[in-house]
Curated annotation (Swiss-Prot):
Enzyme class label: hydrolase
InterPro entries in the record: Aminopep_P_N, Creatin/AminoP/Spt16_N, Creatinase/aminopeptidase-like, Pept_M24, X-Pro_dipept-like
Transit peptide region: 1-31
Family per similarity comment: Belongs to the peptidase M24B family.
CDD domains, per database record: Prolidase
PANTHER family cross-referenced by the UniProt entry: XAA-PRO AMINOPEPTIDASE 3
Cofactor note: Binds 2 manganese ions per subunit.
Protein name as it appears in the record: Xaa-Pro aminopeptidase 3
EC number: 3.4.11.9
Lineage summary: Eukaryota, Metazoa, Chordata, Craniata, Vertebrata
Binding site for Mn(2+) 1: D342, H424, E451, E475
Length: 507
């Protein structure tokens, strides 16, 4: 998608424990990267799949499919290590991180959208219920990154669970996620006085709160009070994004699964595109094939653009008829176990490229191959983008689309026919870690897209008539490694012969 430039041992009720941290149990608890072994998942349904209720999805010790309690604890540990570096020179200052979940959003009265968790919150704990708060607190007398992780979650409520389904509650939250402590959401207010203290640095994204109501009820008064303190509230999102930028082996495995199943969905959608065909049918076919193979949802509204509509980069109406002889550009991806894919392919719906279509398609395919070869440590998306524009400029000259263009104007001319970047970071979000600049040197573990395109509107009088109305983009998902790049979407055909064979395959 183009991107514009154990039965848990709970702490006693807060009413009996001033400030959440003064009880005997808290002082005796061991805080470490290892989950407490005696915490058993409650033998009931929680607010999300668990190894007890969904053994076909999660192994024991996993919080979300493929990701263990230890992995989530390590993420929190790494975040507190970054905060330790940021807070150097602030000896005697407590550090507290606050991350809010998403709320439930509604399309109309009493009709909710499917809930999707805030990805920064999800990245740090794996908890998938709305109206929750994650707190990471430094420990008195211990240096960072030592800390304790606390979840504040919705209270068990039989009347609401009758309508909305089960909630994890404090016992389920602590056992499933492996955090150190869990309380009901209402008990968060008892933590606020400590955070308001002069000796406490709070890390919280008050400029872009993910949950407006929780921000208004709890965090806005805190940020206003801290504005008068020497230790003001500092944003934490960029630190989390720095961690999310480099994927672990477990994350890459999740993304490989998403890439493979999306590739298979593309193959089946290509096969189903017999001309004439409605864009809406291909949309439905693609979504069905993703979901049938285990995807949770689509990663974004797909672009299913036939003919000249492929020149609208984020065309998502998907309601027109694609005629015999036209190509379709399908930009689609899925979300599987919290990680997404993002793939684009362009093909003729009748199964045969015309000569002009083949010329333009082969030009983009060559450019994409050259850009993929640049996906190695030390280069950057900006470097690859510059190379893409150079290559596009040369191809536009070769095809006779750009004439009499001086070398110093080639970039500008190339941007006319490819107004988007070469790619973006990919992970839990499609346009992942948006605060991270594309000038960063690539490192092993980064996942990016490479998606050159050429778009020639049907009213472009400068281009040869045979190319007018054609738009081609080819997009793959790439893991940067120490060696050659790992293409997560390698199973998705893009050679012209392969595409034509699939489209002409017998039913």
């Amino acid at each position: 998608m183009p991107w514009l430039l154990s039965a848990p041992k709970l702490v006693p009720a807060v009413a009996n424990v001033r400030g959440l941290s003064g009880c005997m149990l808290c002082s005796q608890r061991r805080y470490s990267l290892q989950p407490v072994p005696e915490r058993r998942i409650p033998n009931r349904y929680l607010g999300q799949p668990s190894p007890f209720t969904h053994p076909h999805l999660l192994r024991p010790g996993e919080v979300t499919p493929g990701l263990s309690q230890v992995e989530y604890a390590l993420r929190r540990h790494k975040l507190m290590s970054l905060i330790q570096k940021e807070a150097q020179g602030q000896s005697g200052t407590d550090q507290t991180v606050v991350v809010l979940s998403n709320p439930t959003y509604y399309m109309s009265n009493d009709i909710p959208y499917t809930f999707h968790q805030d990805n920064n919150f999800l990245y740090l704990c794996g908890f998938q219920e709305p109206d929750s708060i994650l707190v990471l607190q430094s420990l008195p007398g211990k240096q960072l990154p030592s800390h304790k992780a606390i979840l504040f979650v919705p209270r068990r409520d039989p009347s609401r669970e009758l309508w909305d389904g089960p909630r994890s509650g404090t016992d389920g939250a602590i056992a499933l996620t492996g955090v150190d402590e869990a309380y009901t959401l209402e008990e968060f207010q008892h933590l606020l006085p400590k955070m308001k203290a002069e000796t406490n640095m709070v890390w919280y994204d008050w400029m872009r709160p993910s949950h407006a109501q929780l921000h208004s009820d709890y965090m806005q008064p805190l940020t206003e009070a801290k504005a008068k303190s020497k230790n003001k509230v500092r944003g934490v999102q960029q630190l989390i994004q720095r961690l999310r930028l480099i994927k672990s082996p477990a994350e890459i495995e999740r993304m490989q699964i998403a890439g493979k199943l999306t590739s298979q969905a593309f193959i089946e959608t290509m096969f189903a595109s017999k001309a004439p065909v409605e864009e809406g049918f291909l949309y439905a076919k693609f979504e069905f094939e993703c979901r049938a193979r285990g995807a949770d949802i689509l990663a974004y509204p797909p672009v299913v653009a036939g003919g000249n509509r492929s020149n609208t980069l984020h065309y998502v109406k998907n309601n027109q008829l694609i005629k015999d002889g036209e190509m379709v550009l399908l930009d689609g991806g899925c979300e599987s176990s919290c990680y997404v894919s993002d793939i684009t392919r362009t093909w003729p719906v009748n199964g045969r490229f015309t000569a002009p279509q083949a010329e333009l398609y082969e030009a983009i395919l060559e450019i994409q191959r050259d850009c993929l070869a640049l996906c190695f440590p030390g280069t950057s998306l900006e470097n690859i983008y510059s190379m893409m524009l150079t290559l596009i400029g040369q191809k536009l000259k070769d095809l006779g689309i750009m004439k009499n263009i001086k070398e110093n104007n080639a970039f500008k001319a190339a941007r006319k026919y490819c107004p988007h970047h070469v790619g973006h970071y990919l992970g839990m979000d499609v346009h992942d870690t948006p605060d991270m600049p594309r000038s960063l040197p690539l490192q092993p573990g980064m996942v990016i897209t490479i998606e050159p395109g050429i778009y020639i509107p049907e009213d472009d009088k400068d281009a040869p008539e045979k190319f007018r109305g054609l738009g081609v983009r080819i997009e793959d998902d790439v893991v940067v490694t120490q060696d050659s790049p790992l293409i997560l979407s390698a199973d998705c055909p893009k050679e012209m012969n392969d595409i034509e064979q699939i489209c002409s395959r017998a039913s």
